[in-house]
């Protein structure tokens, strides 16, 4: 069975195609992605209207490329992200998916974007057991309890302000490093001293870890602290080491991300920690997560770099799992939801 997935929740237009075997084995046969990142760079962040227009322009070329890679003219099922994400961006992808499904006469599945990030784990390893997923990107920073791919997830914690990726972008802007901030901060941090400056770790005090925000994050404080450090240096005429600032900022972020994720694994008895989202490509996050997982006897699963960022393959993957388990299609009348809850893997009505 050939399952096609469309991703358009933010600034990537992705079409992925999976060959789903009768035993549930999934093989990637098509994967095409177009990004509008360069169009957003001069604004220092994603502009929803620009993202929506870019999806419109890219959808057909990306679709043709993925189908050509797979060597098929039409799939047996079509899936699309219907939430969470940017309203206009979601509408473009979901509308295209439903139009293709209607034209091809195949069922449509409206799936959860976050479930897609979890589903990629089954593409590159054994079936995911009871796990904790740490999803980190420019739009999301969440700790989720996962029983299995395609099943309702439970949110244990999330950011109360900026997402981690958003904090990277804002700090990069403060330092004049451009957009997106994640890759350049990570690169410069590798040459800096991560102990040079002690930036705050949000919601990591003893009282926080005992209370309702045990698994929650806050990155506005570290962002503000970096801004004050830079402003103070400018006032005093001091030359700062951008590499040290990047390394110290990054350490503050990944320290709290990994410590809370490991804590969630221990508290829930989960044997696996899964990293997902664009920030999962960060070298220091991977390094520290690996060290802390090894120390805690927890298995770490990290997708390949290409599958960390938004893509259509992850949407095809979660749909394939649902189809294999006998889930009914969504129907063409299903809408989109910018704040779709993680407990909903497949949408039948909104």
From Swiss-Prot:
Gene behind the chain: tsaD
PANTHER family assigned to the protein according to its UniProt record, in alphabetical order: TRNA N6-ADENOSINE THREONYLCARBAMOYLTRANSFERASE, TRNA N6-ADENOSINE THREONYLCARBAMOYLTRANSFERASE, MITOCHONDRIAL
Cofactor(s) in the UniProt record: Fe(2+)
Role this protein plays: Required for the formation of a threonylcarbamoyl group on adenosine at position 37 (t(6)A37) in tRNAs that read codons beginning with adenine. Is involved in the transfer of the threonylcarbamoyl moiety of threonylcarbamoyl-AMP (TC-AMP) to the N6 group of A37, together with TsaE and TsaB. TsaD likely plays a direct catalytic role in this reaction.
Enzyme class: transferase
NCBIfam families for this protein: gcp_kae1, T6A_TsaD_YgjD
Similarity remark: Belongs to the KAE1 / TsaD family.
InterPro entries: ATPase_NBD, Gcp-like_dom, KAE1/TsaD, Peptidase_M22_CS, TsaD
Disulfide bridges in this chain: none
Chief place where the protein resides: cytoplasm
Binding site for substrate: 135-139, 169, 182, 186, 282
Protein's GO biological process: tRNA threonylcarbamoyladenosine modification
Gene Ontology MF term list: iron ion binding; N(6)-L-threonylcarbamoyladenine synthase activity
Keywords: Acyltransferase, Cytoplasm, Iron, Metal-binding, Transferase, tRNA processing
Annotated positions binding Fe cation: 113, 117, 310
Record's cofactor remark: Binds 1 Fe(2+) ion per subunit.
E.C. code: 2.3.1.234
Compartment annotation: Cytoplasm
Coiled-coil regions listed in the entry: none
Organism this protein belongs to: Corynebacterium diphtheriae (strain ATCC 700971 / NCTC 13129 / Biotype gravis)
Gene Ontology cellular component terms for the protein in this record: cytoplasm
Reaction equations catalysed: L-threonylcarbamoyladenylate + adenosine(37) in tRNA = N(6)-L-threonylcarbamoyladenosine(37) in tRNA + AMP + H(+)
Protein name, as recorded: tRNA N6-adenosine threonylcarbamoyltransferase
One protein family per Pfam: TsaD
């Amino acid at each position: 069975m050939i399952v096609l997935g469309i991703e358009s929740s933010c600034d990537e237009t992705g079409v992925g195609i999976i060959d789903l075997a009768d035993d549930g084995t999934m093989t990637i046969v098509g994967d095409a992605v177009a990004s509008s990142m360069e169009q957003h760079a001069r604004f220092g962040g994603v502009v929803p209207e620009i993202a929506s227009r870019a999806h419109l322009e890219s959808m057909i070329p990306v679709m043709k490329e993925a189908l050509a890679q797979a060597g098929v003219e039409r799939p047996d099922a079509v899936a699309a992200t219907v939430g969470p994400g940017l309203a206009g961006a979601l509408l473009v992808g979901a509308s295209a998916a439903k139009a293709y499904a209607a034209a091809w006469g195949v069922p449509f599945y409206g799936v959860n974007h976050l479930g897609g990030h979890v589903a990629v784990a089954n593409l590159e390893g054994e079936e995911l057991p009871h796990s904790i997923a740490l999803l980190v990107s420019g739009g999301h920073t969440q700790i989720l309890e996962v029983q299995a791919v395609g099943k309702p997830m439970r949110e244990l914690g999330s950011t109360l302000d900026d997402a981690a990726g958003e904090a990277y972008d804002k700090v990069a802007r403060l330092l004049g490093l451009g957009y997106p901030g994640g890759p350049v901060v990570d690169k410069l941090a590798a040459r800096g001293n991560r102990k040079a400056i002690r930036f705050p770790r949000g919601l990591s005090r003893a009282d926080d870890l005992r209370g309702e925000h045990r698994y929650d994050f806050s990155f506005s404080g570290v962002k503000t602290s970096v801004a004050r450090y830079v402003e103070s240096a400018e006032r005093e005429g001091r030359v700062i080491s951008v590499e040290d600032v990047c390394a110290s900022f990054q350490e503050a972020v990944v320290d709290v991300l990994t410590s809370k994720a490991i804590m969630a694994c221990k508290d829930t008895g989960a044997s696996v920690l899964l990293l997902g989202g664009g920030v999962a490509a960060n070298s220091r996050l991977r390094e520290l997560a690996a060290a802390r997982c090894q120390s805690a006897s927890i298995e770490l699963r990290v997708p390949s770099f290409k599958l960390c960022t938004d893509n259509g393959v992850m949407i095809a993957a979660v749909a394939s799992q649902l189809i294999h388990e006998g889930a009914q299609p969504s129907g063409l009348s299903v809408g989109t939801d910018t704040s779709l809850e993680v407990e909903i893997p497949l949408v039948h009505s909104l």
